[in-house]
Amino acid sequence: MESPLGSDLARLVRIWRALIDHRLKPLELTQTHWVTLHNIHQLPPDQSQIQLAKAIGIEQPSLVRTLDQLEDKGLISRQTCASDRRAKRIKLTEKADALIAEMEEVIHKTRGEILAGISSEEIELLIKLIAKLEHNIMELHSHD
């Protein structure tokens, strides 16, 4: 009998995300907010929405909804690009700067707890296997 690997991976992602959402709730953030803020923080300043969507690996319309929420919370600002009026540049606010370390601490602690009892060799192997699966899937997409 074949292993339901796809279902297992999907379930793992769902419960991991739910735990992150739960742990970030006191900060009034979600896993989606964290991924977005983390990427804005890691990328060079004044990224466009298009560049940010590519870095995260999502479509721009999906990103816009999250950016609207983060802007409403006062965590980002968006300005129209001088050279391309259709493009928006994204910046973290001072409020976000203060929150980033707290948010990253929650993520780091949670990741450590999730990976407890798993050796660094096992984690490296898992990362390699996931990369192979991703490569195979991308190859299949390119042939369809």
Curated annotation (Swiss-Prot):
Q: Name one GO molecular function term.
A: DNA-binding transcription factor activity
Identify the keywords attached in UniProt to this record, alphabetized: Activator, Cytoplasm, DNA-binding, Repressor, Transcription, Transcription regulation, Virulence
Q: Would the keyword Nucleotide-binding turn up in this protein's UniProt record?
A: no
What Pfam families does this protein map onto? Answer: MarR
- Does the record bear Repressor in its keywords? yes
Give the observed phenotype of the deletion mutant. Answer: Decreases expression of genes encoding virulence proteins. Decreases virulence in mouse.
> GO cellular component terms?
cytoplasm
The record's subcellular locations are: Cytoplasm
Q: Which SUPFAM superfamilies match?
A: Winged helix' DNA-binding domain
DNA-binding region per UniProt: 49-72
* Similarity field: Belongs to the SlyA family.
Quaternary structure note:
Homodimer.
**Function of the protein:** Transcription regulator that can specifically activate or repress expression of target genes. Required for virulence and survival in the macrophage environment. Probably activates the transcription of ssrB. Independently of ssrB activation, capable of stimulating the expression of virulence genes found on pathogenicity island 2 (SPI2). Probably activates expression of ispA, xseB genes, and of omp operon.
The protein's name: Transcriptional regulator SlyA
